[in-house]
């Protein structure tokens, strides 16, 4: 059984799904995050499981995205401006625009800096 909860933060909301089979919905969730799937950039924490990475990448491809990847080594103590600079460089190099999707996979420090960068990029790019 999959449980779904919508969490609202001021003018933004987060759709959280938990339960057995939640990964089977990744493709549909990714496709609905943007108008028309085109490009997606996945930013991995360096400790992310290889198997989980395959599941996320296949879900993006199944949803119709061309996928680019970045492995980011962020300190568990927190991200730095240098980490953000690496993410911004990859967004630029991969041609990511506000019509595309950024996916953050990893610990809190990694996901935090990636989501912050996506929010700043091109006036706000969706981040999952």
Can you describe what each PLM-predicted range is?
Residues 79-128:
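Glycine/threonine-rich beta-strand-loop-alpha-helix active-site module
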Residues 1-100:
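ATP/NTP phosphate-donor binding region
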């Amino acid at each position: 059984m999959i449980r779904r909860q919508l969490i609202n933060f001021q003018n933004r909301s987060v759709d959280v799904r938990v339960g057995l089979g939640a990964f089977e919905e990744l493709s549909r969730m990714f496709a609905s995050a943007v108008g028309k799937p085109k490009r997606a950039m996945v930013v991995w924490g360096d400790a992310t499981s290889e198997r989980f990475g395959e599941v996320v990448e296949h879900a993006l491809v199944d949803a119709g995205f061309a996928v680019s990847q970045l492995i980011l080594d962020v300190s568990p103590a927190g991200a730095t401006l240098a980490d953000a600079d690496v993410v911004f460089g990859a967004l630029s190099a991969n041609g990511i625009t506000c019509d595309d999707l950024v996916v953050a996979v990893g610990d809190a420090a990694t996901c935090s800096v990636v989501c912050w960068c996506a929010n700043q990029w091109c006036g706000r790019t969706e981040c999952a």
